[in-house]
A protein has these predicted regions:
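N-terminal, positively charged regions that mediate nucleic acid binding
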Residues: 1-40, 45
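Glycine-rich, mobile lid/loop segments that gate access to catalytic sites or pores
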Residues: 6, 48, 66, 73, ...
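Conserved phosphate/anionic-ligand binding catalytic regions in large, soluble enzymes, centered on
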Residues: 8-10, 14-19, 118-134, 236-260, ...
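Alpha-helical support elements that line or immediately flank enzyme active sites
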Residues: 12-31, 130-150, 270-294
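A short glycine-rich, hydrophobically flanked beta-strand micro-motif that places a catalytic Asp/Glu
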Residues: 37-41, 168-174, 225-229, 295-306
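Short beta-strand elements
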Residues: 43, 124-131, 170-194, 241-260, ...
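Internal helix-turn-beta structural module
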Residues: 46, 298, 306-387
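Glycine-rich anion/phosphate-binding loop at the beta-strand->alpha-helix junction
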Residues: 151, 198-292
């Protein structure tokens, strides 16, 4: 029986993503001056007001209002329309102590190896996913949804479509055949904020021609595909003026949609000692290398950590019965052999002290080759470890 799968994406002007961009911009500003900054930054944006709160311990003191105004300007909002409130304090000394000196170091495990120096900044479960469905090793609906919102933003910023405003969303439903392969585009939903002057029919034509058609070339609409453009009608009020935004409220957009569970920890605004972020990036890195190695067609990697401990308390691999050489527990053993999974090892392997996080905040954290966790440089080593 055929099945239908849906994924969504939002533009950088969506209020939740605006908050993520601000949070990661604060993080990057700190890291660019002090690579060892500890940052846990949360943002709320509502009509006329942006609140930045959280914990920052750094040798550098960022000018948060300046960062917020810069992000607003780049996204397309008028900074003069927002009051900015900052509620920042330093990281808890109790948490810092557990991160700076891990449980293993305190117990002198393995002679206090440097890889065991850092403890996890919190407990939690992180999930990574990969599949052979697309070149990005992501499910096709996820790829298409992000392409739509990216194309929408490009059309706005380039002036290819006049009258667009920053907020926008996309949703794509793809039909899969009995073999689990995507073969047909069932429904496309595109909501684009616009100026009141642009006629609805003109906007619909422009979005179809300059956003939907180029973004969906890999699986074009057919005569039965339902295309819904601004199905609620008028979309003039948008962004924080219409909806309150928060960091951490687009977890499935940031990751793998409905195709994989989420441990619940958000990414943006957190430095790499927070395994919510770094552990999720490593789990994706592992899953992608397992698929690239030809060891499975799709794969879910789950890691779990205890606060203050360096080594994960769980490493699990699930290939959904697509494994080609050995059982899933064998693959998990190979993962433990090939990959360093302590926070210090993850940070070093994926270069997570570099200020690159603003680029992750919108259009998905995965499937983009500019990020180190998207490399498949461990595929051959993994395969050799199994064989």
């Amino acid at each position: 029986m055929n099945q239908f799968y849906t994924a969504e994406s939002v533009t950088e002007g969506h209020p939740d993503k605006l908050c993520a961009l601000i949070a990661d911009s604060v993080l990057d500003e700190c890291l660019s001056h002090d690579a060892l900054s500890r940052v846990a930054c949360e943002v709320m944006a509502t009509r006329g007001q942006i609140i930045v709160a959280g914990e920052i311990t750094s040798l550098y003191e960022p000018s948060i209002p300046s960062i917020v105004r810069s992000v607003l300007r780049k996204v397309g909002y008028n900074p003069a329309r927002f009051a900015i409130q900052c509620l920042i304090h330093k990281q808890s000394p109790d948490i810092a102590a557990g991160v700076d000196c891990s449980l293993e170091q305190r117990r002198n495990v393995d002679g206090s190896s440097p890889s065991l120096q850092l403890g996890a900044g919190d407990q939690g479960v992180m999930v990574g996913y990969a599949c052979s469905e697309t070149p990005q090793m992501l499910p096709l609906p996820v790829v298409l949804a992000h392409r739509l919102t990216s194309a929408l933003t490009i059309a706005r910023k380039s002036g290819a479509i006049q009258g667009l405003r920053p907020d926008g969303k996309a949703q794509v439903t793809v039909e899969y055949d009995e073999d689990g392969k995507p073969f047909r585009l069932d429904t496309v939903v595109l909501s684009a904020q616009h100026s009141p002057e642009i006629p609805a029919d003109e906007l619909c034509f422009e979005l179809t021609d300059k956003v939907i058609a180029p973004a969906l070339q890999v699986l074009p609409p057919d005569e039965d595909t339902k295309i819904l453009i601004n199905p609620a009608g008028r979309f003039v009020l948008g962004g924080p003026e219409a909806d309150t935004g928060l960091t951490g409220r687009k977890l499935m957009v940031d990751s793998f949609g409905v195709f994989a569970p989420h441990g619940g920890g958000a990414f943006s605004g957190k430095d790499a000692t927070k395994v919510d972020r770094s552990g999720a990036y490593m789990a994706r890195y592992i899953a992608k290398n397992l698929v690239a190695a030809g060891l499975c067609e799709r794969c879910q990697v789950t890691l779990a950590y205890a606060i203050g401990a360096a080594q994960p308390v769980m490493v699990e691999v699930d290939t959904f019965k697509t494994g080609t050489i050995c059982a899933d527990d064998c693959l998990a053993d190979a993962v433990k052999l090939v990959f360093g999974l302590t926070p210090a090892e993850i940070i070093a392997k994926l270069d997570l002290l570099s200020p690159r996080y603003t680029g992750t905040a919108a259009y998905g954290h995965f499937g983009r080759p500019e990020f180190p966790w998207e490399r498949t440089d461990q595929a051959k080593i993994l395969r050799a470890a199994v064989i």
